[in-house]
Amino acid sequence: MRFELEGRIIFSKDVSEETQKDIIEVLENGDIFLKGVPEGKENEASKIEGYEFEGKDLKLNMTSGTYTRAHEGIVRLKKPIMEKVGRKHQIGIRDVAIDTYVVTITATPSKVAELKGLKVPECEVELDNEKIKILFKNLGDGELKRNIIDRAIKFVKTELDKQEQDLTFEVCKIAPGTIVSDYKATREITFDKDPTELAEPYGWVKRFPGRGQWFYTAPMAKLFRAFESLIVEECIEKVGFDECLFPKLIPLDVMYKMRYLEGLPEGMYYVCPPKREPEMFRDFVNEMMIKKEIPIDKLKTLLRDPGYVLAPAQCEPFYTFFDHELVDVDSPSKFFDKSGWTYRWEGGGAKGLDRVNEFLRGECVWMGSPEFVEKVRDDTLKYAEKLAEKLDLEYWTEVGDDPFYLEGRKNEDRGIEFPDVPKYEMRLWLPHVKDERKGVAVTSANIHGTHFVEGFGIKDYKDRKVWTGCTGYGLSRWLIGFLAQYGYNYEDWPEIIQKKVGKLPEIPKLITWP
């Protein structure tokens, strides 16, 4: 894909010549756009092709490939510019505006021709032989925050790939996105702020240097544990799960058997064990001490090939436990784990407290007959909905379009049995999103059919059908949904939460933070 942007960063006052000089230093630092870009793909990151100052405006012409796309690049400039000139020149940034933006997707002429007459909201589409051009005009900060550009691109690519849709659309008997249940809060929801924007000023979280990671301080940690306890008591224990402690460092061979490497290989953290050669590491340390920087290239030579991933799904050890074992579906298994973090590489998609690379969940996994597996899935979802109603949290449940074990996969050649609905997803309403009814996914209830049973060679001793299922209760997202509807005022919280939390602890007392 090719991205071409003409836009403006709009300041709070006219930009003086001295301020311009400092801003130009930032603009000429191309490294700003290289964070998160894979080695060898630097030429696909954002580039500033030209710029001009006019009154309060910094006019920019930018281009990019698929990494740090131009509309992400112009937003990424805000922080380093403000760090450079904000306090020094007493100037702020009022808005980011995109005047024109052209996204070009290349495909075969026959596929492009199939899109004739395609209408996409809030943009225009032009077709030209092998090129699909998506044209945007007059986009502001609000449209960027609503991800209009990404949604339009996804919509066009989905139309383009309809003949090669993910297995989800082939398998699912109910259209993904269909709402199957919902609940309206009985109280008036008056809080309408973005909980992420308030969490740090209140001292409940602090940004961690890693992308998509946060330091959760004592008040937030107390709320985490309150929700964890509630979910265990009100959902997990009522379905009769037994707690286990699952490993979080997963061998690549396990991910291969799960076929996760086929569907979402770009969504994991890969782990490279070090070579046990102290002398070579001594050289690494010496160079670091002298240069006062980490010699990354030397470090690469001291690492073995990737052998593991950090658990991206949390349920991986369950299937390994039963690898090539004989089971009895009359004695089904129900395990749950809440012992640590789950990791997914969201790349540029990581944002706020709801879309993070490191998050906590209560993960339930079970195995048994198809009827048993379907009933357990329904129960795990039912109790999650009851908990939301008990807390008077507005929610809806829909048919999911991205079961983790099918995501990104186009075909299945093993004759696997799939359920009629692989995934239900429960979402808590986010009142602060004004332009659409948006929710944060807090519970994902999945049935895998025989997908993992086949992959791990699991059989019933009487050769009866064996299915598996898993439900993830996303603690991080339950918190965000709760705070989005109730806010941070303890007195406004429902009594059940107040009792679980007890007295809220103090935030850390620092001179310079929060």
Curated annotation (Swiss-Prot):
Pfam families, per the entry:
tRNA_bind_4
The family database entries (SUPFAM superfamilies) matched by this protein are listed as:
Class II aaRS and biotin synthetases (SSF55681)
List ligand-binding residues for L-serine: A313, R344, R361, G362, E363
Name of the protein this chain belongs to: Type-2 serine--tRNA ligase
As for family, the record states: Belongs to the class-II aminoacyl-tRNA synthetase family. Type-2 seryl-tRNA synthetase subfamily.
Q: Please list the residues that bind Zn(2+).
A: C315, E363, C470
**Which biological process annotations from GO are given for this protein?**
selenocysteine biosynthetic process; seryl-tRNA aminoacylation
Q: So what does this one do?
A: Catalyzes the attachment of serine to tRNA(Ser). Is also able to aminoacylate tRNA(Sec) with serine, to form the misacylated tRNA L-seryl-tRNA(Sec), which will be further converted into selenocysteinyl-tRNA(Sec).
Report the cofactor remark: Binds 1 Zn(2+) ion per subunit. This ion is coordinated with 2 cysteines, 1 glutamate and a water molecule that dissociates from the zinc ion to allow the coordination of the amino group of the serine substrate, which is essential for catalysis.
Q: Which pathway is it part of?
A: Aminoacyl-tRNA biosynthesis; selenocysteinyl-tRNA(Sec) biosynthesis; L-seryl-tRNA(Sec) from L-serine and tRNA(Sec): step 1/1
The domain comment in this protein's record states: Consists of two distinct domains, a catalytic core and a N-terminal extension that is presumably involved in tRNA binding.
**Entry superkingdom:** Archaea
Q: Which cofactor does it need?
A: Zn(2+)
Subcellular localization(s) per the UniProt record: Cytoplasm
Q: Which organism is it from?
A: Methanococcus maripaludis (strain DSM 14266 / JCM 13030 / NBRC 101832 / S2 / LL)
Q: What is the E.C. number?
A: 6.1.1.11
Detail which positions bind ATP. Answer: R344, W345, E346, R355, V356, R477
Provide the taxonomic classification. Answer: Archaea, Methanobacteriati, Methanobacteriota, Methanomada group, Methanococci
Q: Which reactions are catalysed by this chain?
A: tRNA(Ser) + L-serine + ATP = L-seryl-tRNA(Ser) + AMP + diphosphate + H(+); tRNA(Sec) + L-serine + ATP = L-seryl-tRNA(Sec) + AMP + diphosphate + H(+)
